[in-house]
């Protein structure tokens, strides 16, 4: 039987550079990826290097709250 909360949860990763540049309106949008993480293995915030189509390069995408 499953206890309480699920071990695997869906997380949203957002480009850190697009968020910073969004204030200056240099970027036309914000890149977001949806993925899963295991709560037991990675209890802290997830950060991955992914390709951002708005920055045209690989940048750090950090986990955001839903």
UniProtKB/Swiss-Prot annotation:
<dbReference type="InterPro" id="IPR011332">
    <property type="entry name" value="Ribosomal_zn-bd"/>
</dbReference>
<dbReference type="InterPro" id="IPR001705">
    <property type="entry name" value="Ribosomal_bL33"/>
</dbReference>
<keyword id="KW-0689">Ribosomal protein</keyword>
<dbReference type="GO" id="GO:0003735">
    <property type="term" value="F:structural constituent of ribosome"/>
</dbReference>
<keyword id="KW-0687">Ribonucleoprotein</keyword>
<dbReference type="GO" id="GO:0006412">
    <property type="term" value="P:translation"/>
</dbReference>
<keyword id="KW-0150">Chloroplast</keyword>
<dbReference type="InterPro" id="IPR038584">
    <property type="entry name" value="Ribosomal_bL33_sf"/>
</dbReference>
<dbReference type="Pfam" id="PF00471">
    <property type="entry name" value="Ribosomal_L33"/>
</dbReference>
<protein>
    <recommendedName>
        <fullName>Large ribosomal subunit protein bL33c</fullName>
    </recommendedName>
</protein>
<dbReference type="GO" id="GO:0009507">
    <property type="term" value="C:chloroplast"/>
</dbReference>
<dbReference type="GO" id="GO:0005840">
    <property type="term" value="C:ribosome"/>
</dbReference>
<dbReference type="GO" id="GO:1990904">
    <property type="term" value="C:ribonucleoprotein complex"/>
</dbReference>
<dbReference type="InterPro" id="IPR018264">
    <property type="entry name" value="Ribosomal_bL33_CS"/>
</dbReference>
<keyword id="KW-0934">Plastid</keyword>
<comment type="similarity">
    <text>Belongs to the bacterial ribosomal protein bL33 family.</text>
</comment>
């Amino acid at each position: 039987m499953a206890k309480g909360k699920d071990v695997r949860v869906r997380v949203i990763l957002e480009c850190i550079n697009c968020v910073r540049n969004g204030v200056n309106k240099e970027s036309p949008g914000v890149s977001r990826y949806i993925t899963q993480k295991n709560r037991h293995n990675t209890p802290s915030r997830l950060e991955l290097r992914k390709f951002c189509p708005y920055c045209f390069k690989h940048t750090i995408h950090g986990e955001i709250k839903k």
